[in-house]
Structure formats: structure tokens, C-alpha cells
Amino acid sequence: MAKNPNEARVPQSNLVGVVIIAAVLGFISITSLPYIIPGKKVVSYEASLFTFIQTAIENLSILPTTSLLILSGGFVGYLKPENWRLLGFSTIVLFPIASIFEMFLNPTTHNLWPLEFLVYGVLSIPPLIGALLGSKIGVRI
């Protein structure tokens, strides 16, 4: 039997799995919406290596994306309340990784990368709030 009630939910050894879940949920929260919102006119971008990601970022819908990011953060924060900060940031981690990868392969892209990373930082706020709320809910249950 676990000494801490939080340990009974997800063992510490599964932190990597929850980080992967957080990254996938964040990726889906941002990239899927431009393609599934009815009536949304999507402008496609073909210049980058990851055209799917660029098209999704350029056609971002603020309110639905923010809502999904808060829910994603809340879910992973509930699973691992003691690691809510890491999990909140993990929801956005695939986007800077893709940008860095793209910058190495094609150095002429991402000329405004500091601004781009600032946007990723701003996009990490909703899942951080969700992860904090999820961790508080998880501790009480």
C-alpha cells in the first residue's frame, strides 16, 4: 500500500509515460483544431519541413485551443500532482523541438525564432494553469 495517496494513482516510474501523454495531448490540442472546426478557412503553408504544424500555428483558434490546453494540463496534473510544472510545460515541448530541428536543417527559416519561442511560452500558460488545478483536485481526491 502506498504511503502517499498520490503515489497510488501513477507510480513515479511512469513519469516518462505521463510526459509523453502530455506532449501528445498538447500537440493534438493545437494542431487538430484548424482542421476540425466547421467553417474554418484554413490557409495552408508549404514552405516548412513540418507543414502540418506551421499550418496549425498560423491558423490558431484562441478560445478552443486554450480550452483544450487547460483540459490537457488538468488531466496530466491530476495523474502526477507532484510534477504539475513539468507536465504543464511538456504539453508544448514538441513545438520548440520541431522548430529547433527545422532551424538546423534549414538555417534560413525561423528568422524570428525569439518571437516564436515567446509565443510557445505564452501557449504554455493555459496547460500550466490546468496542471495546477488538476494537481489540486488530485490531492483532495
Feature map (PLM): residue ranges:
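Membrane-helix boundary connector in multi-pass membrane proteins
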Residues: S99-L118, R140
